[in-house]
Amino acid sequence: MAQNFTKLNPQFENIIFEHDDNQMVLNFGPQHPSSHGQLRLILELEGERIIKATPEIGYLHRGCEKLGENMTYNEYMPTTDRLDYTSSASNNYAYAHAVETLLNLEIPRRAQVIRTILLELNRMISHIFFISVHALDVGAMSVFLYAFKTREHGLDLMEDYCGARLTHNAIRIGGVPLDLPPNWLEGLKKFLGEMRECKKLIQGLLDKNRIWRMRLENVGVVTPKMAQSWGMSGIMLRGTGIAYDIRKEEPYELYRELDFDVPVGNYGDSYDRYCLYMLEIDESIRIIEQLIPMYAKTDTPIMAQNPHYISAPKEDIMTQNYALMQHFVLVAQGMRPPIGEVYAPTESPKGELGFFIHSEGESYPHRLKIRAPSFYHIGSLGDILVGQYLADAVTVIGSTNAVFGEVDR
């Protein structure tokens, strides 16, 4: 029986629609396991079809941008770990890259090699984590177990380098805190071989799996126009056939010297995005294999040399009075960049991650803005989910690879 316009209170205070017996409103999350703890979707259904989807975010909001405006530039670095916590070194680097651009610092080549290795290692760890969790959401439990075993060995490498497994804090403004430990590169080579084997195993389990393909093919289709209008980036954009990768378009660190491809999709569906994550693991392995021989050819400095912004090496601080005073000022008061503003984009595992910094010449930013890819991808669910079956909502949400640490900030 048809009913009049109905206003539902209090949980659905903003939803007004004329419904019949085939229509209903479903509150998806934030408790649902596939909403990853922080996403609420208000879904309007007609039968099994979604006719409207309203994402609601903010459950993990911590005021990260305002925190950055009340800390010195170096103090803020550990906070960036808590954005995309599945690839925290990428967040560290994106922030450091923006500050270094503002300061016009020249980074030593050895530090660039180490940074690029860490970025690509983090990319592989993030990608294999996505594939495992996405497969688990769809129902492939065994893939989750195999992938997590390999991911653990990647995290062991990060722990050997910086002492932390998840929130690495592995980058510094001006370089890196540590040189690579002895035999670390040998462990990295072993991990690359293990990652190749894990990738082959996952492809054997999924690529020709009829259920997996039925759940992903033609589900969550994104068109090039939709991707551009929503400001999508990364694999969400490249899945539509647009070959845009900031490592190619605006190269940073050593990417200009490296030989790698940018895989693109054809259909823009969830299966295309899964395939691109698998292909990008191959490209990261290819990049690291080019970087390993570069490391031995570099000199030892791992931090930029600029007494106005960067502390002297520890041996100088312990033996030279001027270096000690300079270090005291930088720690107690913080560096003071010139007046100006900068936006520096980077290609994180999720897409375009950039920091906008406006400086008034003080020891903390006047304005700090984070451009996080997951924020735009979650917003696009309002378009992508319309017309999909309710059972496919989990697949579509998972295929965006959104992490809510950088959605809510």
From Swiss-Prot:
<dbReference type="InterPro" id="IPR022885">
    <property type="entry name" value="NDH1_su_D/H"/>
</dbReference>
<dbReference type="Pfam" id="PF00346">
    <property type="entry name" value="Complex1_49kDa"/>
</dbReference>
<dbReference type="GO" id="GO:0048038">
    <property type="term" value="F:quinone binding"/>
</dbReference>
<comment type="subunit">
    <text>NDH-1 is composed of 14 different subunits. Subunits NuoB, C, D, E, F, and G constitute the peripheral sector of the complex.</text>
</comment>
<keyword id="KW-0997">Cell inner membrane</keyword>
<comment type="function">
    <text>NDH-1 shuttles electrons from NADH, via FMN and iron-sulfur (Fe-S) centers, to quinones in the respiratory chain. The immediate electron acceptor for the enzyme in this species is believed to be ubiquinone. Couples the redox reaction to proton translocation (for every two electrons transferred, four hydrogen ions are translocated across the cytoplasmic membrane), and thus conserves the redox energy in a proton gradient.</text>
</comment>
<dbReference type="GO" id="GO:0005886">
    <property type="term" value="C:plasma membrane"/>
</dbReference>
<comment type="similarity">
    <text>Belongs to the complex I 49 kDa subunit family.</text>
</comment>
<keyword id="KW-0874">Quinone</keyword>
<keyword id="KW-0472">Membrane</keyword>
<dbReference type="GO" id="GO:0050136">
    <property type="term" value="F:NADH:ubiquinone reductase (non-electrogenic) activity"/>
</dbReference>
<dbReference type="InterPro" id="IPR001135">
    <property type="entry name" value="NADH_Q_OxRdtase_suD"/>
</dbReference>
<dbReference type="GO" id="GO:0051287">
    <property type="term" value="F:NAD binding"/>
</dbReference>
<keyword id="KW-0830">Ubiquinone</keyword>
<keyword id="KW-1278">Translocase</keyword>
<dbReference type="InterPro" id="IPR029014">
    <property type="entry name" value="NiFe-Hase_large"/>
</dbReference>
<protein>
    <recommendedName>
        <fullName>NADH-quinone oxidoreductase subunit D</fullName>
        <ecNumber>7.1.1.-</ecNumber>
    </recommendedName>
</protein>
<keyword id="KW-1003">Cell membrane</keyword>
<keyword id="KW-0813">Transport</keyword>
<keyword id="KW-0520">NAD</keyword>
